[in-house]
């Protein structure tokens, strides 16, 4: 029987779960989200936020989409917008990689860069300004608070993990950007499937430990870091703090070195936030109580999206970089 997708947004999901054989003790299972249509976990939310807006009747011909992004959500929205015929404007901190900017332009998006020091807050503020200038023309999708974000992970990512492990998942690890992956997957496994002993682990940069601060009842003090895609510097509306059992902080260096290990030792092209998530799994395995647990880790994106970043900074001589 033939299987033809009516447009490329419909091809999200069903990404492979791969056992790591040389990193860790063989119980770390990596969900390789770079196998999505625009090569990151954000393809899922990019598609669902647009589908949801269409269903609700707020997105129709003539309406233009606007969204702040650190890169991967923007790329996901850009490919879905192109596939379904919408115009898209994205606001993004100027510190994000040049590869992301090029991909956004290639997919037809209008890109507005914001001050790097202001982080995602600056990008969000700019997006809100654009929409306020003409609310009838522009629609802000709001990935950080849009319920369509965790919903798609509850409907797809969670069930995929459950089915691929036959329900034998003990620990779920996710870096936190919008919080949608962690929230949606945990809701499905702990709620729908009733596995209340699942240990859900949030990963964030040690340089911007806002989740740990929030859970401890401390003042939120974000800071700059180099782990693109996680650590937005605030607690997103889509992050359900009640679902988190443990928070692991990862340094820039740990994230980068582990991403390199994934490429060199496991043959998995992995981005910086993927390195952070696996580094968190390795930290857990230092505790004997985690030795025999099946640990599922989300690898959000491919290393190819970070060629101009610190991930590849010292791998080539100047001569090797000449064309």
UniProtKB/Swiss-Prot annotation:
Transmembrane regions: none
CDD domains in UniProt: CBS_like
Notes on how activity is controlled: O-acetyl-L-serine causes the CysE-CysK complex to dissociate in the absence of hydrogen sulfide.
UniProt EC number: 2.5.1.47
Ligand binding (pyridoxal 5'-phosphate): 72, 177-181, 273
One Pfam family linked to the record: PALP
Keywords: Allosteric enzyme, Amino-acid biosynthesis, Cysteine biosynthesis, Pyridoxal phosphate, Transferase
BP-aspect Gene Ontology terms: cysteine biosynthetic process from serine
N6-(pyridoxal phosphate)lysine found at: 42
Alphabetized Gene3D superfamilies for the sequence: 3.40.50.1100
Cofactor(s) it depends on: pyridoxal 5'-phosphate
Gene Ontology terms for molecular function: cysteine synthase activity; L-cysteine desulfhydrase activity
Record's function text: Two cysteine synthase enzymes are found, this enzyme and CysM; both catalyze the same reaction. Cysteine synthase B (CysM) can also use thiosulfate in place of sulfide to give cysteine thiosulfonate as a product.
Entry similarity comment: Belongs to the cysteine synthase/cystathionine beta-synthase family.
Annotated protein name in UniProt: Cysteine synthase A
Organism of this sequence: Salmonella typhimurium (strain LT2 / SGSC1412 / ATCC 700720)
